[in-house]
Amino acid sequence: MLEIRFVRASPDVVKADLERRGTPEKIAWVDEILAKDARSRELKVQTDELRRRRNTIAREINEARKTGKDAAPLLREAAELPQKIKANDAEQEEISGIIRTRLMRLPNILHESVPKGKDDTENVEIRRVGTPRTFDFELKNHGQLAADNGWADFERAAKTSGAGFYFLKGGLVMLDLALQRFALDLLGKKGFTPVIPPFMIKRDSYEGVTDLDDFEKVMYKIDGDDTYLIATSEHPIAAMYQDEIFEEKDLPLRLCGLSPCFRREIGAHGLDTKGLFRVHQFTKIEQFVFCRPENSWQIHEELLANAEEVFTKLGLPYHVVNICTGDIGTVAAKKYDIEAWMPRENAYKEVVSCSNCTSYQAASLNIRVRDKENFETKHLVHTLNSTAIATSRALRCILENYQNRDGSVTIPDVLRQYMNDREFL
């Protein structure tokens, strides 16, 4: 979320950002926040004065009694003070809740390089890497190919779990595991520490890391509990250091999360028939970094370079796009996507999302770094995240781009060391 002191100091910046995003209807929220904030500070002054008065009035009552003065007015005032304090505290608590809710629904401040656009059709291509392969035979749908070869079972998964699930089998299991090891090894050489996080997270922690609308659209809630299955390891890793203070020497902290990811929202995008691309459950390796604010933009480019290296070494053509104002969402200040080439559709499809969230998540989670020059001064850290690889999407890429006429699939060179030097599925 945005910090109240930032909104208080720079309301025009927030309003201009909302205009740039194409959400001018939220500008009224800024004025509401400022009005509530002014009332909250006024109440604090009043309540502090009431508490000071409560401390002094007891002495005045004793003094009046000692000197024979009428203490009745003081006694009446003393009797009223607790109720006034209680009423002020209740109003301030209510106002604080309203302010926090509004702050959490205001989006992050966009970086100046984010392109203006209404939706994903206006994202801006930065570069293309690799040359798409030409085929002299008709490609099979990746899901059909997997089913025909006994590498996946979508029909029985639909029977046991519903649409959007799959049983992965045989060689495709080994290929999935090879992708995981490849990505972990690559990131390990770059100083990332692997983390397997909890696969469930409490709502109060989850609220600090994602768009509140996702609770209705994306996440699976555990019945009878205020707990959710994670949509990505980014979320529990971001909340891992909630309410903690880093020392400068400990940053940047580079972590790579390995986890299943659970998402409800695929129906809104259209589900591939017998496919691995849009599913309710998949495995993902996620890059995550906590850093000092002055380093975050450089690290953002590093995370993108790491993800590009994954797909370059896999020999999969892709392009990088700069996500526009109408597609970027609430949390990121800037976001890149990598979209890999899908030859059956003759199109690029998203396989990586790489975001700099600046201080937005840290403000919600209260994660700070101590200033080494001034021990008492603490600043919000910046958080960044990027897919390294979502294995189900990478599997689709490989099944299409490396498909052979006889129905076999060539295993990318870089993965063969993890598959006993096997060349084909």
From Swiss-Prot:
Organism of this sequence:
Methanoregula boonei (strain DSM 21154 / JCM 14090 / 6A8)
* Protein name according to UniProt: Serine--tRNA ligase
Q: Which family does it belong to?
A: Belongs to the class-II aminoacyl-tRNA synthetase family. Type-1 seryl-tRNA synthetase subfamily.
Would you kindly state one Gene Ontology biological process term found in this protein's UniProt entry? Answer: seryl-tRNA aminoacylation
Pathway given in the UniProt record: Aminoacyl-tRNA biosynthesis; selenocysteinyl-tRNA(Sec) biosynthesis; L-seryl-tRNA(Sec) from L-serine and tRNA(Sec): step 1/1
Q: Which GO terms describe its molecular function?
A: ATP binding; serine-tRNA ligase activity
What quaternary structure, including any partners, is listed in this protein's UniProt entry? Answer: Homodimer. The tRNA molecule binds across the dimer.
User: What EC number(s) would the UniProt record show?
Assistant: 6.1.1.11
Give the binding site residues for L-serine: T232, S233, E234, E286, T387
The reaction(s) catalysed by this protein are: tRNA(Ser) + L-serine + ATP = L-seryl-tRNA(Ser) + AMP + diphosphate + H(+); tRNA(Sec) + L-serine + ATP = L-seryl-tRNA(Sec) + AMP + diphosphate + H(+)
Q: Name one GO cellular component term.
A: cytoplasm
- Subcellular localization: Cytoplasm
Annotated function: Catalyzes the attachment of serine to tRNA(Ser). Is also able to aminoacylate tRNA(Sec) with serine, to form the misacylated tRNA L-seryl-tRNA(Sec), which will be further converted into selenocysteinyl-tRNA(Sec).
List the SUPFAM superfamilies hit by this protein, alphabetically: Class II aaRS and biotin synthetases, tRNA-binding arm
- In this chain, ATP is annotated as bound at R263, R264, E265, V279, E350, V351, V352, S353
Q: Tell me the InterPro entries matching this sequence.
A: aa-tRNA-synt_IIb (IPR002314), aa-tRNA-synth_II (IPR006195), aa-tRNA-synth_II/BPL/LPL (IPR045864), Ser-tRNA-ligase_type_1 (IPR002317), Ser-tRNA-synth_1_N (IPR015866), SerRS_1_N_sf (IPR042103), SerRS_core (IPR033729), tRNA-bd_arm (IPR010978)
Its chief place of residence is cytoplasm
Domain topic, free-text comment: Consists of two distinct domains, a catalytic core and a N-terminal extension that is involved in tRNA binding.
Keywords from UniProt, A to Z, are: Aminoacyl-tRNA synthetase, ATP-binding, Cytoplasm, Ligase, Nucleotide-binding, Protein biosynthesis
